[in-house]
Design a protein with these regions (language model features):
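ABC ATP-binding cassette signature C-motif
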Residues: 1-170
Length: 170
């Protein structure tokens, strides 16, 4: 579980977007294992969620088609989004609700490589604590950017710092 830190504008989010295939590389090579199921969590949920759809539509679009409605409801419940959210338009959700929906989608996809950009933004304390517990128990590989030092220290077992075009590992 690796945390990536550095000052604003040093390229942390850009690196994550390149890894997730959201931005093109300008050079070099990148190889993923054939069994890697990457899940990308953007700090700006409008980049990953269909704002023209409903919560249920987005769950159906981005999760395994064999997932039952009961499992969808159960996962939404874990992220404090009850059944009443199924028919809600994503565009009407608050920033925190969109964040919780995006995290629920990662959970449903059963990713084994999580790339998380500021995952605690817009989350309230109970959900941050739940996410911390989930990530520390998860067997998935984790690469995360966050400015939340407490969360970083509790979740990650390695820290990589980008500073003045240099990289340091702690």
């Amino acid at each position: 579980r690796v945390g990536l830190v550095g000052h604003n504008g040093c390229g942390k989010s850009t690196l994550l977007k390149i890894l997730a295939g959201k931005l093109a590389r300008t050079g070099g090579r990148m190889t993923m294992g054939s069994t890697t199921r990457m899940g990308y969590y953007s700090q700006n949920q409008t980049e990953t969620l269909d704002l023209g759809g409903t919560v249920l539509g987005e769950l159906r679009r981005l999760s395994d088609p064999r997932t039952s409605e009961e499992e969808l409801m159960s996962v939404l419940g874990l992220f404090m989004l009850g059944q009443g959210y199924f028919d809600r338009d994503i565009a009407t959700l608050s920033g925190g609700e969109r964040s919780r929906l995006a995290l629920a989608l990662l959970f449903l996809r059963r990713c084994n490589f999580l790339v998380l950009d500021e995952p605690t933004n817009h989350l309230d304390l109970p959900l941050i604590e739940w996410l911390e517990d989930y990530l520390t128990r998860s067997t998935a590989t984790l690469l995360m950017v966050t400015h939340d030092r407490y969360f970083l220290d509790n979740v990650c077992n390695e820290i990589i710092e980008i500073d003045d075009q240099s990289v340091y590992s702690y």
